[in-house]
Swiss-Prot record:
Gene Ontology terms, MF aspect: transcription coregulator activity
GO cellular component terms, semicolon-separated: core mediator complex; mediator complex
Assembly, per entry: Component of the Mediator complex.
The family this protein is said to belong to: Belongs to the Mediator complex subunit 18 family.
Subcellular location: Nucleus
Compositionally biased residues, Low complexity: 91-101
Function: Component of the Mediator complex, a coactivator involved in the regulated transcription of nearly all RNA polymerase II-dependent genes. Mediator functions as a bridge to convey information from gene-specific regulatory proteins to the basal RNA polymerase II transcription machinery. Mediator is recruited to promoters by direct interactions with regulatory proteins and serves as a scaffold for the assembly of a functional preinitiation complex with RNA polymerase II and the general transcription factors.
Name of the featured protein: Mediator of RNA polymerase II transcription subunit 18
Region Disordered, residue ranges: 85-112
One record GO biological process: positive regulation of transcription initiation by RNA polymerase II
Pfam family membership, one: Med18
The gene coding this protein: srb5
Chief localisation class: nucleus
Length: 265
């Protein structure tokens, strides 16, 4: 499938006003989203056909494996979170007994790493020359087993690189998914952990990646058959229509292609 996108940077002071505007435009209340995003890098040509038990060989896996076609990319493994997963205050002994985990654990948190659901998301490098005013790229996703995904990812030819948290609000407007979000980083430690954290810090310990506190507005449409030019043209027109409706608030535009390059070198 193909994903068509437009993006805008939203200053922190404009965040609340834009939320209200999107609520009115879409006639829905925002759906708050929290996600863990684990980044993996291909260290050899992957073969997702050799998946371990628990994933199955469903159509999503078959399609994803065909799309990767033995090429090497960065991919992300995404897991939904709730605010309760971050509840609790760091204990006084955190600095001593959790230094190996790369972060302070949240005492009293309900988070259970072994029950964490995951999905593997692949996003290709945006197509060159599709349209100078829109971002288009191949996309695919597949469900993964709950819990520790590292052994499976390693077996498929991927190694863990880093992780972060995404916080935002989602709206649906006709066939457009609108996501107003920001990237949050874990507390700085002496060194980066070599595997995903099994416990999460207190939410207040997370820091925005963008120091100014700005947000990203992403508008996306998924087209199942990217070879159908009429569908692609219609989807593009819908995004341009949204851009026109929001032009007094934000400037939706395509992203720099190389800034979204997912190829592993």
């Amino acid at each position: 499938m193909h994903e068509l996108l437009l993006f805008a940077s939203v200053p922190s002071h404009q965040h609340h006003e834009l939320l209200q505007q999107l609520t009115g435009l879409t006639a829905m209340q925002p759906r708050h989203c929290l996600e863990r995003r684990l980044i993996f890098k291909a260290t050899r040509k992957p073969d997702l056909a050799n998946m371990r038990s628990g994933t199955g060989q469903g159509p999503d896996i078959v399609r994803l494996n065909k799309m990767l076609n033995g090429q090497m990319f960065y991919t992300q493994v995404v897991g939904p979170l709730s605010e309760a997963d971050f509840d609790g205050k760091p204990s006084s002994s955190d600095s001593q007994d959790v230094s190996m985990s790369g972060t302070h654990e949240a005492a009293g948190s309900s988070y259970d790493y072994d029950s964490q659901p995951w999905r593997l998301e692949f996003r290709d490098t945006p197509e060159a020359g599709f349209r100078s005013t829109i971002t288009a790229r191949l996309a695919a996703s597949a469900a993964l087993p709950k819990g520790d995904v590292v052994p499976s990812m390693n077996a498929w030819g991927y190694s863990f690189v880093t992780e972060y948290v995404v916080e935002g609000d989602m709206f649906i407007y006709n066939d457009i998914v609108i996501f107003l979000h920001r990237v949050l980083q874990y507390p700085a430690t002496g060194q980066e952990p070599h595997e995903p954290r099994r416990q999460l810090p207190s939410f207040r310990d997370l820091a925005p990646l963008e120091k100014t506190g700005s947000y990203i507005l992403q508008a996306a449409i998924t087209v199942q058959d990217g070879s159908n030019q009429e569908l692609m043209r219609t989807a593009s027109q819908h995004l341009f229509g949204l851009r026109e409706q929001l032009k007094s608030a934000v400037r939706l535009e395509h992203a720099d292609r190389l800034s979204l390059d997912t190829r592993a070198r």
